[in-house]
């Protein structure tokens, strides 16, 4: 995967992380994505109308600043976006704050603001292995005419000690 990580032919990826009342896990999930070994990606966190401190924690941890964004309405069922934020310290991090509408609506909002041809969706309690995106994108590079989607393997770490991670 090392050659793939340095290749100019690797597709850029938009990682979409939807979060509704995820104050306990969202920071760790964001850190996990940001530590990926991948040449070019953006992370779009969609705060789906959380009533806890999810958005406030993100704003504090990643120095979010309100940003005007142009929203393509390529997917109509994306709900009402209240605001978008960019990190002052992490250029590939964008946060969308929207009214609660459920996971599919949150992901649609993320797709509408994404910049890249491939996207990956994850939950706010997920952690990635360092090469997860490289492994996921590889089939697209090997057979772009036939591959339209890939999936990952989910492993439960409840009660386990994570040595490398957020």
Indicate residue ranges for each PLM-predicted region.
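Short aromatic/hydrophobic "clamp" motif used to bind/position activated sugar donors
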Residues: 119
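Conserved donor NDP-sugar-binding/catalytic core segment of glycosyltransferases
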Residues: 131-166
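The conserved acidic donor/metal-binding loop of glycosyltransferases
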Residues: 123-127
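Short, acidic, metal-binding catalytic loop of nucleotide-sugar glycosyltransferases
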Residues: 31-40, 60-68
């Amino acid at each position: 995967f090392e050659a793939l990580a340095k290749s100019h032919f690797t597709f850029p990826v938009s990682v979409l992380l939807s979060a509704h009342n995820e104050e306990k896990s969202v920071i760790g999930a964001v850190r996990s994505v940001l530590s990926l070994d991948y040449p070019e990606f953006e992370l779009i966190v969609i705060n789906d109308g959380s009533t806890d401190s999810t958005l406030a924690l993100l704003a504090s941890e990643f120095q979010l600043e309100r940003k005007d964004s142009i929203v393509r309405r390529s997917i109509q069922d994306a709900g009402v976006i209240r605001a978008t934020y960019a990190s002052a310290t992490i250029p590939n991090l964008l946060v969308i704050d929207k009214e609660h509408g459920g996971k599919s609506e949150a992901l649609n909002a993320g797709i509408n603001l994404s910049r890249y041809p491939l996207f990956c969706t994850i939950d706010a309690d997920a952690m990635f292995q360092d090469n997860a995106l490289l492994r996921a994108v590889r089939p697209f590079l090997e057979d772009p005419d036939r591959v339209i989607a890939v999936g990952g393997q989910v492993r439960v770490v409840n009660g386990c000690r994570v040595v490398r991670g957020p």
